[in-house]
């Protein structure tokens, strides 16, 4: 079973002036293109791994307003993408699961261990596992999150990299990273392999 997690940000969005001017597409075209790329990617995976479940949680780049304090959690362009992907994959036996209005989604491994997927806008990697364990009232085995655009692991959390690397905004804040993704393999009995896949064009 492959659990494919889409932790966002797949849209440049409208939250930073620099990324608006840097984007070569408006937000609507970004939604269509990102959705099509995700569908194509999932279908490529299915050719190699027949049993796939996909999980979507939205991030901060899809906010419908620039001001963070003005943004309601559910007012997010990225919520459109799983609906589009679900419709495109309806003739396949691929599950498309999203958190609805919540910015996280959960699933369990074969041995019953709880995994929480979240973008991470509202979380810190050092405390997120403890906070979700309290929130859900259940022991969380691992948190998988994005947002920080750099691979990190520890304290019951794995931070995924970004497929785009650094944009003008992140460079202006002196953040830098290589485009990368994380592949985790659960062998059983707490034996877990974590692989950092550095992306090159």
Across the structure, where does each feature detected by a protein language model lie?
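Short, solvent-exposed loop/turn elements at beta->coil junctions and helix N-caps
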Residues: 104
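Core catalytic region of metal-dependent phosphoesterases/phosphodiesterases
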Residues: 1-88
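Conserved beta-sheet core of the metallophosphoesterase superfamily
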Residues: 46, 75-79, 84-92, 97-101, ...
């Amino acid at each position: 079973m492959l659990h494919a997690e889409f932790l966002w940000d797949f849209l440049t969005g409208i939250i930073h002036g620099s990324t608006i001017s840097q984007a070569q597409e408006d937000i609507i075209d970004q939604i269509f293109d990102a959705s099509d790329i995700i569908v194509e990617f999932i279908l490529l995976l299915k050719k190699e791994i027949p049993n796939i479940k996909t999980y979507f949680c939205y991030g901060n780049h899809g906010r419908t307003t620039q001001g963070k304090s003005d943004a309601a959690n559910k007012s997010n362009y990225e919520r459109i993408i799983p609906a589009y992907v679900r419709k495109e994959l309806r003739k396949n036996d691929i599950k498309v699961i999203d958190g609805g209005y919540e910015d996280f989604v959960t699933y369990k491994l074969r041995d019953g261990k709880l995994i929480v997927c979240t973008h991470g806008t509202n979380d810190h990697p050092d405390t997120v596992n403890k906070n979700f364990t309290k929130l859900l009232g259940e022991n969380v085995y691992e948190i998988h999150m994005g947002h920080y655009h750099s691979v990190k692991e520890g304290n019951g959390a794995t931070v995924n990299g970004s497929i785009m690397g650094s944009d003008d905004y992140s460079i202006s804040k002196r953040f830098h990273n290589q485009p990368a993704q994380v592949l985790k393999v659960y062998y059983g009995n707490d034996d877990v392999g974590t692989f950092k896949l550095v992306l090159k064009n």
